Amino acid sequence: MRRMWATQGLAVALALSVLPGSRALRPGDCEVCISYLGRFYQDLKDRDVTFSPATIENELIKFCREARGKENRLCYYIGATDDAATKIINEVSKPLAHHIPVEKICEKLKKKDSQICELKYDKQIDLSTVDLKKLRVKELKKILDDWGETCKGCAEKSDYIRKINELMPKYAPKAASARTDL
């Protein structure tokens, strides 16, 4: 009887050691988290900020005020926005204070809230080459939204195209100068 238990125990231990427990992040996982926290960490280093958890927490809240789109959603998930439901911001500030790589921090955040690593950046439209007339109104609205602009009074697709062409030199000067159809 003991021999059977020992054999079964050994089999279970072997199976657990072979099965992947906490997998490391695969390429492309936590794209927004790694990119955003990486920029945040670099910003702190560039400004010679004191690396204490309290300071980092305050700086992250300030940094998140400027965040838009998916990055704002990340800030919401970690509790760095005013309207956040949960506060796991200390899961970022404490490890960052000890200079733990952002990949490891995001991996730990993934275990707390899997939504954090499901965030992906939207595919960017190359404004220098795209034919705006072939885009859908939804995509045209998205371009304006990414710039923080709206098109009041726009009813037709041509209205959105006109507004984008009007604002392109301000928000995408390289694309505006590369375009020949303006």
Curated annotation (Swiss-Prot):
Name of the protein in question: Mesencephalic astrocyte-derived neurotrophic factor
Impact noted for substituting residue 179 to K: 14-fold decrease in secretion
Any idea which GO molecular function terms this record carries?
growth factor activity; RNA binding; sulfatide binding
**Keyword annotations of the record:** Deafness, Diabetes mellitus, Disulfide bond, Dwarfism, Endoplasmic reticulum, Glycoprotein, Growth factor, Lipid-binding, Phosphoprotein, Sarcoplasmic reticulum, Secreted, Sialic acid, Signal, Stress response, Unfolded protein response
Q: Which disease is it linked to?
A: Diabetes, deafness, developmental delay, and short stature syndrome: An autosomal recessive, multisystem disorder characterized by childhood-onset non-autoimmune diabetes mellitus, short stature, bilateral sensorineural deafness, developmental delay, mildly impaired intellectual development, and microcephaly.
The record describes its quaternary structure and partners as: Interacts directly (via SAP domain) with HSPA5/BiP; the interaction inhibits ATP binding to HSPA5/BiP and subsequent nucleotide exchange. Component of a complex containing at least CRELD2, MANF, MATN3 and PDIA4. Interacts (via C-terminus) with ERN1 (via luminal domain); the interaction is decreased in the presence of increasing concentrations of Ca(2+).
What the entry lists under Gene3D superfamilies is as follows: SAP domain (1.10.720.30), Saposin-like (1.10.225.10)
Q: Where is this region: Interacts with ERN1, EIF2AK3 and ATF6?
A: 96-158
Please give the family membership noted in the entry: Belongs to the ARMET family.
Give the coiled coil ranges.
Answer: none
Signal peptide residues on this chain, from the entry's feature table: 1-24
Cellular component GO terms, alphabetical: cytosol; endoplasmic reticulum; endoplasmic reticulum lumen; extracellular region; extracellular space; nucleus; sarcoplasmic reticulum lumen
